[in-house]
């Protein structure tokens, strides 16, 4: 149902202390949710018709607030936005406690399934026992326009964003995070709940401290289950989806698979199964080949790799349970796990935008040159706003101050990568072309057609491969001087089958490395999943109910 209580709350806390919130109901801002229902109190049959047919979502799971949510809570700035709802910083008018309020517009609950999802989310959050690792629900209520879930405020940001900022964790830190995630899974399973949407974005840190508690959020896709019960509905996020979900025959074991995917990402910075298309991702999951050859895996302990393998066991009957994961040698000896920052390798991939990324940047420039004016209009406007002295480049300082103006549109991870791209630019600034290339990389604007066109640009002889000479030629055009060394580094990183040249698949993999897979992991609709499932059945990748 979308993330709650995202990190801008930390800044908001100071604003609250300086009287952003009204002291009384009458002084508050307009009630945003009442206005959304389209049947306001202004008159005519429209309003009356809505009242007669008013949708009651929560039933016994919640309470009515006839005067609107702001009778009890003062709403402030927006903290996050999901498919169905918006999360606001809010304050309890009586206790003055700062909380998060996820408001789900009733207009977006178009089907009985949507309504049931919200009702079940509340029921599950009430059903699960209090835990330091699960965000607590304070109140669930509804008014004419929306359902409101008031919960504790988490100010430390997403696990997702910390992974991006660091590149990846040390083994010791990854073990601590994995333990928390699997303890949440164990608690859910013991109480008859499958989470069904475990991913880094659905874990928030309570505060900004390094040792902050990690909390699970968003039970919007969770479901109650009984021992032996199987489900067929395809839900979740593609990169974290277990193979039996795609086969439409699954149980609680899927949460262990998703936790295994998160562990893999914590250790190396990218997911184990990914491809250019949704169907490609699904087929990679069904194949189940896990890459432990690429850096930094040679430096990861055998115990860590063993746990990843057992959590990503394709057969759910053989996959570890939550209890078995917690008893695994690697987690049992977590305090002895290597504390060496493995992240230097992956973080440097994200940070540099040089060496391998010099080639990638060249490819992005090729793509940018062929984009329509409409496709780059927003990026061009952003560049103009940030280039305050109109000198045609965005300096480090201009970028930092400009980010604040666009803060609501850029995730922390994107901000971090933009700044780091400038740091390693050489001149400490971005011209428009470089800014456009970085933005393309961050916003995942390069689709299959764009990538194919860029590949053909480099594959001068049309033999289906980018060979060292062609790579050399491309880098000469881009002004590189240490060409032979750069070509060697690029091939070392991109040429995964070590045949001395870059195939289209390897080129696409290079272009996808970075933030794009994270963008793609956000909520996918049931309709798209059903279409994907049909395609997989038609091409023979999946046989229904086949484990």
From Swiss-Prot:
Residues 37-49 have a biased composition (Gly residues). It is a lipid-anchor. Keywords: ATP-binding, Calcium, Kinase, Lipoprotein, Membrane, Metal-binding, Myristate, Nucleotide-binding, Repeat, Serine/threonine-protein kinase, Transferase. It comes from Oryza sativa subsp. japonica. Residues 1-53 are annotated as: Disordered. May play a role in signal transduction pathways that involve calcium as a second messenger. It comes from the Eukaryota. Residues 73-331 form the Protein kinase domain. This is Calcium-dependent protein kinase 16. The gene is CPK16. Residues 337-367 are annotated as: Autoinhibitory domain. GO terms for cellular component: cytoplasm; nucleus; plasma membrane. There are 3 contiguous domains conserved in the CDPK subfamily: a kinase domain, an autoinhibitory (junction) domain and a calmodulin-like domain. The autoinhibitory domain (337-367) inactivates kinase activity under calcium-free conditions.
